[in-house]
Amino acid sequence: MNTNDFDFELPEELIAQTPLEKRDSSKLLIIDHRQKTMVDSHFDHIIDQLNPGDALVMNNTRVLPARLYGEKPDTHGHVELLLLKNTQGDQWEVLAKPAKRLKVGSQVNFGDGRLKATIIDELEHGGRIVEFSYDGIFLEVLESLGEMPLPPYIHEKLEDAERYQTVYAKENGSAAAPTAGLHFTTDLLKKIEAKGVHLVYLTLHVGLGTFRPVSVDNLDEHDMHSEFYSLSEEAAQTLRDVKQAGGRVVAVGTTSIRTLETIGSKFQGDIQADSGWTNIFIKPGYQFKVVDAFSTNFHLPKSTLVMLVSAFAGRDFVLEAYRHAVDEKYRFFSFGDAMFVN
């Protein structure tokens, strides 16, 4: 298939720049790909789409304040680093600007030298491996000096950094939020659990590759980014029990889908505790092994995330649903509205 097969018209004013005041007040488009139906609803009604005995699977990763602004001590030139992933110890892969000035051995200071970074390797596309030095605990230093790395299509400053975290965010490590989870409130999750739905958590640390456009025409030539995932034995056992009892595995967001399907592909459809790196690319033709339904936000044209949704619900029907969402003025992307896919 061709990348352009997943293009659609999106007016720029539909790209949500700020979160709604109430997390669960966003709109929800409920689609059923077998019945070919679409229903306009609101997110707090997602509980009506869940049955007792189902499992609702959420990604509990927490976004790091991963954008750092500093300067080179020799030239006082301004430098921006965006932390991508922890490679080992105090070494991180980062995206650097301006990268051309940062050669191996270069040093960057942040916060009057409270945090120092030394370039130890150069990667392509402005990537660098840096080693940090600091006093105290790294995450605490980062919390005081770093800024939340909002996606490139959001131009307004975020008033409350916690609005770019899910209410169940726990495991530090992401460069972007698993945005399908931003709609849930603690109260809504309590109601869902009281209905007899199992709440299950996994971890996938979202990398910036999630925003990287597909740069090839032929999907088979696309090089998918890798992200770290983890599923505990307790979570795996709950999911096995749910499947055995005839319940559904309902994933919250594409990151949960990619984790579950990575594990399902690795263990021939079985659900086992596992951790590692995944670069799974789910596109039309893929046979789903674990996920029975899911919620997700509205994604960028020609993105791998639209391709993933199309793999589950069919390209033509998904693009029809997206056209409906545009006509009905749904809000798109990270702070936008949601879709529930049966």
Swiss-Prot record:
UniProt main location, coarse: cytoplasm
Catalytic reaction equation(s): 7-aminomethyl-7-carbaguanosine(34) in tRNA + S-adenosyl-L-methionine = epoxyqueuosine(34) in tRNA + adenine + L-methionine + 2 H(+)
An example Gene Ontology CC term for this record: cytoplasm
GO MF annotation list: S-adenosylmethionine:tRNA ribosyltransferase-isomerase activity
Cellular compartment(s): Cytoplasm
Keywords, comma-separated and alphabetical: Cytoplasm, Queuosine biosynthesis, S-adenosyl-L-methionine, Transferase
Keyword rRNA processing: no
InterPro entries noted in UniProt: QueA, QueA_dom1, QueA_dom2, QueA_sf
Enzyme type, top EC level: transferase
E.C. number: 2.4.99.17
One Pfam match: Queuosine_synth
Gene Ontology biological-process annotations: queuosine biosynthetic process; tRNA wobble guanine modification
Pathway: tRNA modification; tRNA-queuosine biosynthesis
Functional note: Transfers and isomerizes the ribose moiety from AdoMet to the 7-aminomethyl group of 7-deazaguanine (preQ1-tRNA) to give epoxyqueuosine (oQ-tRNA).
Record note on quaternary structure: Monomer.
Membership in a protein family: Belongs to the QueA family.
NCBIfam families linked to this entry: PRK00147.1 (NF001140), queA (TIGR00113)
Entry-linked PANTHER family: S-ADENOSYLMETHIONINE:TRNA RIBOSYLTRANSFERASE-ISOMERASE (PTHR30307:SF0)
Protein name: S-adenosylmethionine:tRNA ribosyltransferase-isomerase
Species of provenance: Streptococcus pyogenes serotype M18 (strain MGAS8232)
